[in-house]
Amino acid sequence: MDKLGGFIGNFNSFISIDLRRSKNFIMIRYALFFLIIFNISHAVEFQGDFKQGSFILGKTDPKSKVFIDNRKIRVSKDGFFAFGLDRDRKNNVIIKIQNKKETKLIEKQVFKREYKIQRIDGLPPKKVTPPPEVYERIKKDNKLIGDARAINSNLIFFKDKFVYPIDKYIITGVYGSQRILNGKPRRPHYGIDFHAPEGTPVKSMMDGVVTLVEKDMYFTGGTVIFDHGHGISTLYMHMKDINVQKGQK
């Protein structure tokens, strides 16, 4: 889907954008920096903020292999790779760049991020503590989302700039915040909530391929997932109408 050429659908009352990289949660930031590490054989570039919950974009020799904490990740034909830092990560991240000539280890400190406490009251009790009769539905929804998020394609849209999905908005929920729903603490929020009038068009945050379209999930309502390549995906939730189909670019 071209982020400027079409719309995913329309708002209900708000939309929650969930940005994730495999099992590591990420937050897309617009104020980015480059760190370039040179040696005799090649240079390694990093774009991003090495803080808890951040998204890191890297570039190296396309023939190199890249490992993050000993886990091999994809490297594109032009040398791009990407990974996320967990919300609560406490250890430094070890990046291994390996080619035929040498193996280079890079250790980067991961800085702590302060998270907000968000209280939301007045929610329907069944949305805070679901009744037993919907457990199977929730389990099915979670599997559909998990399968879509697990896709690790060779697309390289992730290296382009992310944009917000709507032009005029109010942010009502931020990544990493601890939510207390109807007085009950819940797991941290792994997305961004936008409030806008009902019917507001929603666009993809960057080019990608639609991997999930569901009109009525229990927790997330109208839900769409885009694959941007290398395990990077964006999720669009709580939409009233959906105007894309699975497999659409």
Predicted regions and their residues:
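Cationic-aromatic interfacial patches
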Residues: 44-113
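Beta-rich strand-turn-strand
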Residues: 244-249
